[in-house]
Regions:
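Sec-dependent bacterial lipoprotein signal peptides
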Residues: 1-18
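Ser/Thr-rich, Pro/Gly/Ala-heavy low-complexity intrinsically disordered linkers and tails
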Residues: 15-126
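N-terminal module-boundary/linker segments of secreted carbohydrate-active enzymes
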Residues: 114-168
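Substrate-binding cleft and catalytic face of glycoside hydrolase catalytic domains
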Residues: 137, 170-320
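Noncatalytic carbohydrate-binding groove/subsite architecture in carbohydrate-active enzymes
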Residues: 276-381, 388
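Aromatic/acidic polysaccharide-binding cleft in carbohydrate-active enzymes
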Residues: 352-429, 436-442
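Carbohydrate-binding surface patches
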Residues: 441-483, 516
Length: 525
């Protein structure tokens, strides 16, 4: 298959002239009114198949966008559109490694950045009709972060004796979020908190013997046909009180909890899923008990964390129809086991709420779980979720596990490439960055998304090349462009390796994407 040798990329830059040399990963503080816009994410090829296993019970159906593997002539394109509106501010202390911390408060969407019609120090060129356009004035969703779960993973082990690999913005992937399980120890969360990581909690089987403080109901059958209790019908206030006590205890040990989920996969009956709710029951549990309890201690409520995109709409509609629950839920979330990319729900953003993907195990590709084929599938899944569903946050399943389920393979004792391609997003598109619209026609097998720091105007471009050969790109930067683009490459032999700076001359820069790679280009403001 013919692979186009190059394609242009237009970046409509902000009014402030960008000067070279500042830290491109410092999200800074955000303080702005609501803003909204629509746009699209360019490119896409879904590579590989997924299944994997989860401790939540048995084999998983494939994650979104499965196919036969990375092919040399992979093709396809994807675009996402939607509106986003939010307000708030972002602030956080510096992380342990000296890099920027995850925001500890809301990072709201700021006012639309103005566009400079003139040319900056490095500008002066003209756009071409075949170019990809990155329009930084067309703001999409605010990025909250990227992370994984430590549920059932125990305390620090050989994987986390070097926590820098997970959370450092200078030595590792710079993950910014951690999902922990109600009832687990806090060892991993304490380590993550040292880096300014946003920690939040999910109950598995609320009210069961697996959740501290609840009665042993594992032999009971609830109205939905699953073993377990229905707290909203039996012990709702007691359960809410237990959750409050657990959150307060975590805070006293140095782990502030950002949000609490109503339940893990309320639509499933997995072996570790001992509480199932109908959509109406979950909304009632939130509106009557969980919402008021969390509001009293300043912790956000998340729901419904369904298994996939097929289950999400029914629960979302039930919460939307329950005035109390709708007012209590700040974050809507789902897992992504089968059933494709999560649906776009513009009413979430327009109501000042956030939309997260909170679990998926993308599994192995052609029997390989540690290398680039599976990593490219994961990167494409992130790209599709961010550009099509306008998600604010994205999570993989386990931090570490045997087989294909963790970012660290405890069998082979290696960090999977999946961790490093997550780092292509998380280390650079920091909490408070805003995705901006992209349009055009990237080469076959290439997907491009872009992000901007509304304070410093640093630009981050993530390019995925799923082809088995290198692919050229010609970036065209209009307005007041950055003077340089610094590439950070993850490929078969590199893990977030910094390359030589690319000079932007007459608004243009030419680059080559290595075969089967994810490269982040950082525009130094």
């Amino acid at each position: 298959m013919r692979i186009r040798s190059s394609v242009g990329l237009v970046i409509l830059a902000p009014a402030v002239v960008l000067a070279c040399g500042s830290d491109p990963t410092d999200a800074g503080s955000l303080d702005g009114g609501a803003g909204g816009s629509s746009g699209s994410g360019s490119g896409g090829v879904s590579t590989g198949s997924s299944g994997g296993t989860s401790s939540e019970g048995g084999s998983r159906p494939p994650a979104s966008g499965s196919s036969s593997g990375v092919a040399g002539s992979s093709s396809g394109s994807g675009s996402g559109s939607g509106s986003s509106s939010d307000a708030g501010s972002s602030s956080g202390a510096a992380g342990r490694d000296g890099g920027p911390a995850a925001a500890s408060a809301d990072a709201g969407l700021v006012q639309t950045v103005g566009v400079d019609g003139g040319s900056g120090t490095c500008g002066g060129g003209a756009a071409q009709t075949s170019d990809i356009t990155i329009d930084v004035s067309n703001l999409q969703q605010t990025i909250r972060g990227f992370g994984c779960s430590s549920a059932w993973a125990g305390n620090l082990n050989d994987a986390t004796n070097d926590p820098d690999t997970l959370w450092s913005t200078t030595k590792g992937a710079g993950l910014t979020m951690l999902r922990i399980r109600y009832g687990d120890g806090l060892g991993v969360a304490k380590a993550a908190a040292q880096y300014g990581v946003t920690v939040w909690m999910t109950p598995w089987g609320t009210g069961s013997s697996g959740a501290p403080g609840g009665p042993d109901t594992t032999t009971q059958i609830n109205p939905n046909g699953c073993k377990g209790s229905m707290p909203v019908l039996t012990n709702g206030q007691d359960l809410a009180n237990n959750l409050v006590s657990w959150v307060q205890n975590a805070k006293s040990q140095g782990v502030p909890i950002y949000a609490v989920s109503a339940e893990n996969e309320p639509d499933s009956c997995g072996i570790n899923q001992t509480t199932s709710y109908s959509p109406g029951q979950l909304a009632a549990w939130i509106g009557s008990y969980l919402g008021p309890a969390m509001s009293n201690i300043g912790v956000k409520v998340m729901a419904p964390e369904t298994q996939n995109a097929c289950g999400f709409p029914g629960y979302f509609s039930a919460i939307q129809s329950n005035a109390a629950a709708w007012g209590d839920v700040s974050i809507f979330a789902s897992h992504e086991y089968g059933c494709g990319t999560l649906p776009s729900e513009p009413s979430i953003a327009s109501s000042g709420k956030e939309y997260w993907e909170t679990e998926v195990d993308t599994g192995a590709v052609n029997g390989d779980s540690d290398g680039m084929p599976s990593a490219l599938h994961l990167a494409q899944t992130i790209h599709d979720d961010l550009t099509k569903a306008n998600l604010n946050a994205w999570h993989y399943w386990w931090l570490w596990a045997g087989g294909t389920s963790g970012l660290y393979d405890t069998t082979t004792k290696v960090w999977r490439k999946a961790l490093w391609v997550m780092g292509n997003f998380s280390r650079f598109a920091r909490p408070g960055y805003v995705r901006v619209s992209t349009s055009g026609n990237p080469p076959s097998g290439v997907a491009v998304s872009a992000y901007v720091n509304p304070s410093s105007h640093a630009m981050v471009i993530v390019a995925i090349n799923s082809n088995s050969s290198s692919t050229g790109l010609s970036f065209f930067v209009s307005g007041s462009p950055p003077c340089t683009l610094v590439p950070w490459e993850t490929s078969a032999n590199k893990n977030l390796a910094m390359g030589s700076s690319v000079t932007v001359s007459s608004s243009r820069a030419s680059v080559t994407l290595p075969a089967q790679s994810v490269t982040t280009f950082v525009g130094m403001p």
